[in-house]
Structures are given as structure tokens and as C-alpha cells.
Amino acid sequence: MQERLATRGLDVDVRELPASTRTAADAAAACGCEVGQIVKSLVFLVDGAPAMVLCAGDRRVERIDGRPAPADEAREATGFAIGGIPPLGHDRELPTIVDESLRRFERVWCAAGTPNAVFDVRVEELLAALPHAEVRAV
């Protein structure tokens, strides 16, 4: 995962945590941050095709015209299981929508491929690594 992130211009340290980060609350407790600083990487089916939605951990997705992808389709689209899906570095590029509320933080924490792996990154660096992402209310 570290190499995949580096190819997107992110110089971050992937950390393995002893506790699961499967939920935003678990991740926030393990990382010592606010729940809102956790980036939920969610796969939605929009017009039948997978799309990545990056949502703040303290928010719900309410403005996406689509539905959450089943676990098997999320894994097929990203190469990762739900609970460990990173915001980028997937097996294939996906259209990405980023929750604009993430900008209220300087740094956020993201899953890094497994339920126990995370990395922290400046929000603006994450957005720079996703140049084609649409940033808006989700």
C-alpha cells in the first residue's frame, strides 16, 4: 500500500494498529483523533457503475444518486475489502466524490488496505493526489 500511495505523490507512513479500524469510531479511538477526521472510503453504484465516495467519519452520505455497492462488488472494484478500502491506490481508477466537510480539518486519517492499517495526511495533499475528484456535499 505504501508504494501505491507513493506513486500518487503521497509521502505518508502506513501504520498497523493493534485494534481494528473497521468503523469510524474504532479508527478515531485508535488514532487519537476526532471521528470527523476519519475518511470513510465507500463504494457506491452510480448509474450501475462503481464510484468512490470519501466521507467524513461523522457524516452520512445523503446526496449521492446511487446506492452502496455490495461487499463483493466493492472488493472487485477496488481490490480491497470493506473496512480497509483506502481512498486511492485501487486496482482500477474510479470516479471519486469527496465530502467537502473534510476541509474543516488540516489532517485526516484514511484506511490503508486492511482493517488495521491507516495513514494520516493533510487534506490538501489528499485532494492533490485525486486531481479528478469532485469535491462537494455528499
Cite the ranges covered by each PLM segment.
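Extended, low-hydrophobicity, polar/charged segments
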Residues: 1-138
